[in-house]
Amino acid sequence: MLKGYSFFRDEAGEVWKIETPDLILRLSTADDISDFYKWEYNTETIRYFSICENQSMEEVWRDFVHRTEDPSSVNFTIVNKTTGEKLGRAMLADLIRGWKVEIFRIYIADTSNRGRGYGKQSMLALMQLIFEEYGCERLYLDHYTGNPARKLYDSLGFHFEGTLRANCRKNGVLHDVELLSMLKPEYSSLYLNGK
């Protein structure tokens, strides 16, 4: 367990909340949908995501329900531990415990809350959950080329696997994405072996 990070489990033993030094990542609920809608309506929040501009509340609701019902998907809301303010969202997809998972979407919505280490703490919490709790061997993510979050991913030890050309469509425009990954031995070497 990383210092300052804790898991909280439900009666079935599943992790429903992760605490970091400054944040709580908790399973998303229907009460979060209006925040997701507001955040994902903001062009700055969705700049580097394949989220269509001007999506309706109904579309956000349908996506939430679909992902909540999908056993290969886990959705977290990122909350300031001190103030209780909702800060952002993290979504896992393609989860096959013991093998692989994708960080499908992660963001801190309000630009005034960026640059405070919240993204790093959120990523570390997810990495710990993925490798130590879910027992995954592979974690991967992709991002639009030019996304400034690439610096964070590099600093955490992710490896560049290549560019997927014209892989995502947003508002009718095709975008290249860069594929990054981390394997369990790499995570262990960086975060569990005293380094």
PLM region spans:
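A short, well-structured alpha-helix characteristic of acyl/acetyltransferase catalytic modules
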Residues: 1-62, 186-195
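Conserved GNAT acetyl-CoA-binding A-motif
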Residues: 132-142
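Conserved beta-strand-loop-alpha-helix junction that forms the acyl-donor binding cleft
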Residues: 140-150, 167-170
